[in-house]
């Protein structure tokens, strides 16, 4: 994958599409965007730039380059799974409209988002970015997201969406991800290929500006076993001809040089030719266009074919109003990003996203004056020797927070399991037991046996909790990227839980390994699930 500084990209390589992965204060982002547009305006044709980003409005555990920016100055909403857990489509639209306004204020006019993939393979490392395992729910979420960010059509009040990853990245073999050679294949053992396409149909109906194919190659199904960016049957025949999508086909980052699955043995110029013939309009991660220009000059690809893609890219800019006025108001950006109304709406969503899974002893909600020992257990694995346990004593009305378990009437134990993030993968077997995801289950069981305990678990995958579910875990809460304040409002009843599970959690690792990767958990049959899709209690 090539890279170039912004000025060099504009003046030497004539680039006009950029992705901003950094997190900065709104004023800095707005000034940078204006400087970029001023540079573009000074060139021969004055074609404006369009700046894209991955999601940057979510509380997330495993934020990393290419997935999510993580916490920023923008309003902080639940993770995508949490948005789905709300089952509130009006608030979902509010989220999208709010985030769209924040993005536009700093000059971000294109989103590499959202994921229409379905979380049917519980081991997949990108489940956190999905709207769960159910195609109907994901379709409704994607519809509200696209309409909220873009409006009914692209305009100067839109952020253009790039719905991903066609035709659905969920059904990966053994849950391995196709960023890597050992995860290059998607498969459909349950025969549910069409199920995974359904949310993309919703995105198309809502008017998504672009669609991004995944790196994966289809295993079986009679399709050519090449990555979806090279796969004419998937892009040209299915997405464009059958589904009627005529917007931009935006490759994921680096399929030409880094993830050329199925075309490893052909030259880079031939890879460009194959991807263009399949239907790709723009290549992410290819900052230096020299090779692509040679592909055209040599006659491998016609200039007419390139012009078809250029027309789409220019039309998007025209529709967004960038040719009329690409600049933003720095003062307005500072007032818009993270404004009070946005924060209030996000705070409501953070509470609505929380799911009460179990309340067998009716311990919840906690009575006033309860003495609480509040411990968060999170070991990211990125800081060797870092302290996993953090004890919180927030100033929260009605409860008394204490420093030790011994002083407490009840323990609130918030577990944040993590595999270490998608890019920590080395191709080894994926195990969803808590002990394999940086949780000391001996410590958890000691706490459970010592004191009445409320266990909150942050789900970025459908974790297997068998190791701690031995009769003492009678109060369990699911979070999907939220805040301590929101969690405390749930446990006290200041906000009554309303969330519903966006996926099914497997009862044990054997169920995980026996699952059919393209089949949602609620269709796996008896004996698979512990907490079912749609499960959620209240007071």
Each language-model region and where it sits:
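C-terminal non-catalytic regions of proteins with extracellular/luminal or membrane-system context
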Residues: 105, 259-260, 265, 290-303, ...
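Gly-rich Lys/Arg/Thr-decorated short loops/hinges at beta-loop-alpha junctions or inter-strand turns
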Residues: 13, 75-79, 121-126, 173-184, ...
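Surface-exposed extracellular loop regions of Gram-negative outer-membrane beta-barrel proteins
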Residues: 210-213, 217
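N-terminal beta-rich core of secreted/periplasmic extracellular enzymes
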Residues: 1-167, 197-210, 227-285, 297, ...
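Structured secondary-structure scaffolds
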Residues: 179-200
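Short coil/turn segments at secondary-structure boundaries
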Residues: 47-52, 215, 287-288, 308-309, ...
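Short beta-alpha connecting loops at secondary-structure transitions
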Residues: 126, 182-188, 220-225, 257-280, ...
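Short acidic/His/Gly/Ser-rich catalytic and metal-binding motifs that mark active-site loops
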Residues: 59-63, 119-123, 169-175, 220, ...
